[in-house]
Amino acid sequence: MIKNRVNFFIFIIILLSVVLFFLRIHFLLLLRTEMKFKEVASCFEEIEPVSGRLEITRLLAALFAKASPQEAEIVASLSLGQLHPPYIGTQFNIAEKNLIKAVVQLLDIDEAAIKSEIKMAGDIGLVLQSHGWRTDKELSVADVYKTLCRLEEISGTGSQEEKIQLLSDLFLSLDPLSAKFVARIILGKLRLGFSDMTIIDSLSWMHAGDKSLRNILEDAYNVCADIGLITQTLKEGSVDAIKKMHVTVGIPIIPAAAERLPTAQAIFEKLGVCFAEPKLDGFRLQIHIDKTNKKEPTIRFFSRNLQDMSSMFPDLYQAFLKLDISNLICEGEAIGYDPDTNEFLPFQETIKRKRKHGVEQAAAEYPLKIFLFDILYLNGQECLNMPYIERHEELQRLLSDTSIELIQVNEFKKITDAKQLQDYFFAAVAAGLEGLVVKRPDALYQPGKRNFNWIKLKRQEEGHLEDTLDCVVLGYYAGEGKRAHFGIGAFLVGVFNKKADMFQTVAKIGTGLTDTEWKELKKKCDTLTTHTKPKNIECAKELTPDVWVTPQIVCSVRADEITQSPLHAAGKTAEKLGYALRFPRFMGYRPDKSVEEATTDEEVKRLYEDQFVK
């Protein structure tokens, strides 16, 4: 009897403890208020002068920890200067001159005076911050986000005036510090100096207290390239929820990439029996097709840097519409060709398709075909974990019963010895192609990974490196002599150090551009100028350009060789010299690549070592 009473009292105590626990949680939730945008701005202000990635990661982790799942999703996007992931895009369509009008309206100051202040400060955000005005409002993160989305949506007659008024009202409701960062987001000049990979690190620190979750988070991001969605999923659920993230038609997969080796012999020694495909100098596309709604099928074309390029390819849209499938994700190389000779055109001709207006005319002027080389998803089934050879067979079956002229499966050939690979390579080069991509037969498709499952073998021109490098423009030098009136005479480029999330100098380029291209380059750079060196650029004092540029422009560079350098930062350590390009020459822009897809310092190091392979 006594024992039963004791058990009853223990049960009552446990029950009361549970009830009190949930009441406490409920009370805390009631007390919780929306995150104010001022908190985000204060964090950005702390991050701005910091160059160390670990400290930036710590500050971001603390910010995400305080946010709700929905707020964390917004903060992740805003911290990269965007409202939406790249595959949706962010377009405010408001020029700085109209932003200035909003500031004039806000501060009731002469426009000429504001322009003078901006010229002195070099940043409209700093000018806003310097003018202290009082506001009784404290807008939440959600409030600011909704207003920015509204700003993006306004269009049509009188839209600019409406945007100016909306901006002026928004600034008036913000404190000056918050207004500074909002203005920078709108102009695409946030410049916090970190990428999506730093956000992934910060999420790991937030959840686990270390970077142990980085690989899990990165794998999820690679198959679902939406950093906001990754952030929200982790905050809402758990690591298990992240592990369950999967391929979704309409959300691009971060493409797999190929490594380099200098010779056919080296590749065969690495892979053994393998398959080789011609390497085409075209526009790599990831095609997403959803025909589950027969009346309104969706076909989208994503570039390798995840931008939606669907408007460029009306002809390919019609071609893919003919495929008898429910849904599909595949990859291919779109390349322009001369319809009279059927010969392929250089990349710079293919890229002329990229325009906002006159797309139908461009399609007629620059006809193209697409050569598919991989399939990632078909009729509800992921194909990522299928071996390469099975994926290729699936691709061939998909097109075996069709005769769609614009869509073809890229040629591939089984290779059983190094000589056969060398002969196939020479045949590809003789046909005017770049070379080969050689693939391991049992390789799974690994999104976002660059490894030796795929290996590039490219033609080598006498006295030149066997490959071009994709470099990022970091700044430019004032012109002298003939180029004085251009205002630019040379420019500084760098490569990407993924581990440090930094861009390291590798060359100063002064050749390879026509007069028109010099003017075009300066125009591109002048939209990205910054008065101080961006903190994600590593550059020796002796190489300091006259004008710094926010790293956003990727260009193709050819050089005679790679040399060791005491000045350039690429690959440089306390014990080792850096690397530099000898006789670098500009070959064209790579608008299909993001700066994070540029050549890395590790690749430069391997290219340097490959020069000594006979």
Question: Language-model segments: which ranges?
Answer:
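A short-motif feature that recognizes glycine-rich, charge-decorated loops
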Residues: S310, F503-A540, V549
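C-terminal structured "cap/appendage" subdomains that terminate the fold
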Residues: L528-R582
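Short glycine/proline-enriched turns and hinge-like loops at secondary-structure junctions
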Residues: H288-D290, P447-N451, D467, R483-G489, ...
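Short alpha-helix boundary/capping segments
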Residues: M1-R5
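Flexible, glycine/threonine-enriched loop-and-boundary segments that flank and lead into catalytic domains
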Residues: A256-F275, L421-Y424, D442-G481
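Detector for conserved single-position "signature" residues within domains
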Residues: V429-L433
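N-terminal nucleic-acid-engaging modules of covalent nucleotidyltransferase systems
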Residues: F27, L31-D417, K498-I509, I537-E542, ...
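Hydrophobic alpha-helical signal peptides and transmembrane signal-/tail-anchor segments
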Residues: N7-L29
